[in-house]
From Swiss-Prot:
It comes from Carboxydothermus hydrogenoformans (strain ATCC BAA-161 / DSM 6008 / Z-2901). Pfam families: Adenine_deam_C, Amidohydro_1. This is Adenine deaminase 2. GO terms for biological process: adenine catabolic process. It is an enzyme of class 3 (hydrolase). Belongs to the metallo-dependent hydrolases superfamily. Adenine deaminase family. Its EC number is 3.5.4.2. Keywords: Hydrolase, Manganese. Its cofactor is Mn(2+). Gene3D superfamilies: Metal-dependent hydrolases, Urease, subunit C, domain 1. The gene is ade2. One of its GO terms (molecular function) is adenine deaminase activity. It comes from the Bacteria. It catalyses: adenine + H2O + H(+) = hypoxanthine + NH4(+).
Length: 570
């Protein structure tokens, strides 16, 4: 309960505050002004701004004070670390509230994954709220580890940290009023529904919004953003590791629309979290691009709080939670002090807290693969022409190529000369024995194999290799370590990064994970993989059958334009 008696008495100056930040330039989220004065805090809440005395004081000597930043949509799993370690990265960067979608771990572990995320993200000096995964499995052309219907989601919808339904990717299900989709919308009625519908417009967009969808984070152009804003949606401006849209969308933010715009990172990988930070990086980018500073700060704070109905967050004002950032300048946006509920939790970029033990047994031991049958790795050739997945530098979309490929004994074979490697996806959740096999062009791999259990959206095991023997060796290594990333050559494991939590997250620190990632990248480069590709990010999206043009799942080669499985051989 809010300590009303204490708040009133401190606000009136009848008793000292627990904490006073003196001589600050305080950002007012409502007027966009910086006002010189003190900030008084009692029992984790702001009692007032002005002139106050307290038991503990910090003389800020004119430093700038803002509310804690809010990330409106992020997948913790993309950081490859557990929630507590994720918090240790976000909090020093100034993000004190994150709205997460546990879509990735739910695809592996179902309701156990959601329960783990709720438990592992509690009792941390950061507000972590959940949006329930709306599309598990994401498509019918892959095998996920779980199926989440409206019935499963109803178990969580009234949890105090569950705010609604996560990104509604299945917009055809909405537009065609599929029965199960209508049930999910009914279960979450009265809660928020986040959108995910790039490219649709006109009456289809209108119908999608009419179903109850409130926001969109997939816009890539200002025109697309304006159409959504004009129809009442909130706009999430995204700057992730894989997809960066902030600068393209800023022109859609003006004095009429700004209050319905806020920032999200969606996916931030370890290197970016360490080097760039979180929402503070987006604030810096936007201001550097010429955006109005007060508007940008509102987008990082009060706008997101209002959208998510978190009415005690996003402002330095009486009765609000004392989630406070202190900056020495407004160029770099690196907080000197970070206060959560009035307690100092980070200083000069360093967290002042650790995690706590969490029972994660329900999301470990997720490598449920049948014994590998080498025959399943053979690709029959009716001719010497094949459908080949063509990689595009710095893109997650691929090209649908038709190439001449070497054939031996009636089967397609890899070719270093033609830069053609074999790609395989092994189902790893249900012991089905499913293996999808195809060919890719452009990776540059000369020998060996690289493999990962981070493979959107179902997170099966994906491996690219030049020989079946190394592909099998890579699979066996990932089984041994409980999931993760590995590189193999000549039957020898050259390096691995264990991700034992659902095959998606490490139980080690962010810095340790990044160090191992860098080692793996160096090894992969030595095997010939081009600098144009982040090898494991590339692998992670090669099995996502909703991103054009050709993808591979455990069920086979998918032509995204027809949403069907097609043979490799032409």
């Amino acid at each position: 309960m809010k300590p009303i008696k204490d708040l009133v008495e401190v606000a009136l100056g009848k008793k000292p505050a627990d904490l006073v930040l003196k001589n600050a330039q305080v950002f007012n989220s409502f007027t966009g002004e910086f006002v010189t004065g003190d900030v008084a805090v009692v029992a984790g809440y702001i009692a007032g701004t002005g002139e106050y005395e307290g038991k503990t004081t910090y003389d800020l000597q004119g430093a700038y004070v803002t509310p804690g930043f809010i990330d409106g949509h992020v997948h913790i799993e993309s950081s490859m670390v557990a929630p507590a370690e994720f918090a240790r990265a976000l909090v020093p960067a100034g993000t004190l509230t994150a709205v997460v979608d546990p879509h990735e771990i739910a695809n592996v572990s179902g309701t156990a994954g959601i329960r783990y995320m709720l438990e592992a993200s509690s009792n941390l000096p950061i507000n972590i709220y959940l949006m329930l995964p709306s599309c598990v499995p994401a498509t019918s052309l892959e095998t996920a580890g779980a199926v989440l219907t409206a019935r499963e989601l109803s178990e969580f919808i009234n949890h105090p940290r569950v705010l609604g339904l996560g990104e509604l990717m299945d917009y055809p299900g909405v537009l065609n009023t599929h029965e199960e989709m209508l049930k999910k919308l009914a279960v979450t009625e009265g809660k928020l529904i986040d959108g995910h519908a790039p490219g649709i417009s006109g009456k289809e967009l209108t119908a999608y919004i009419a179903a109850g969808v409130n926001s969109e984070h997939e816009c890539t152009t200002a025109e697309e953003a304006r159409e959504r804003l004009s129809r009442g949606m909130y706009l999430m401006l995204r700057e992730g590791s894989a997809t960066k849209n902030l600068l393209d969308l800023l022109p859609a933010v003006d004095r009429y629309t700004a209050s319905r715009c806020f920032f999200v990172t969606d996916d931030r990988h370890p290197e970016d979290l360490i080097k760039l930070g979180s929402i503070n990086h987006m604030v810096k980018l936007a201001v550097s691009a010429g955006a109005d500073l007060p508007t940008v700060l509102q987008m990082a704070t009060i706008n997101a709080a209002n959208y998510f109905r978190l009415y005690d967050l996003g402002a330095i004002a009486p009765g609000y939670r004392a989630d406070i950032l202190v900056f020495e300048d407004l160029q770099e946006f690196k907080p000197k002090y970070v206060f959560k509920d009035g307690k100092l939790v980070a200083e000069n970029g360093k967290p002042l807290f650790t995690g706590y033990p969490v029972d994660d047994r329900a999301v470990r031991n997720t490598m449920r693969l049948k014994e590998i049958n080498p025959e399943k790795l053979k690709i029959p050739a009716k001719s010497n022409r094949a459908r080949v997945i063509g990689l595009i530098p710095h893109q997650i979309v691929t090209k649908k190529l038709e190439l001449e490929v070497p054939v031996e004994g009636g089967y397609f074979k890899t070719s270093t000369e033609k830069d053609i490697a074999k790609l395989a996806v092994f189902e790893r959740h249900n012991y089905t024995g499913n293996v999808g096999v195809g060919l890719i062009h452009g990776l540059g791999l000369k020998k060996g194999a690289i493999a990962s259990t981070v493979a959107h959206d179902s997170h099966n095991l994906v491996v690219a290799g030049m020989s079946d023997e190394d592909i099998i060796a890579a699979v066996e290594e990932l089984k041994r370590i409980g999931g993760g990333l590995t590189v193999v050559a000549d039957g020898q494991v050259l390096g691995s990064l264990p991700l034992p939590i659902a095959g998606l997250m490490s139980d080690r620190t962010l810095y340790e994970v990044q160090e191992e990632l860098e080692k793996l990248h160096r090894i992969v480069r030595n095997l010939g993989v081009s600098e144009n590709y982040d090898p494991f990010m590339t692998l992670a999206f090669l099995s996502l059958p909703v991103i054009p043009e050709l993808k591979l799942t455990d069920l086979g080669l998918v032509d995204v334009s027809t949403f069907s499985v097609v043979p490799v051989s032409l």
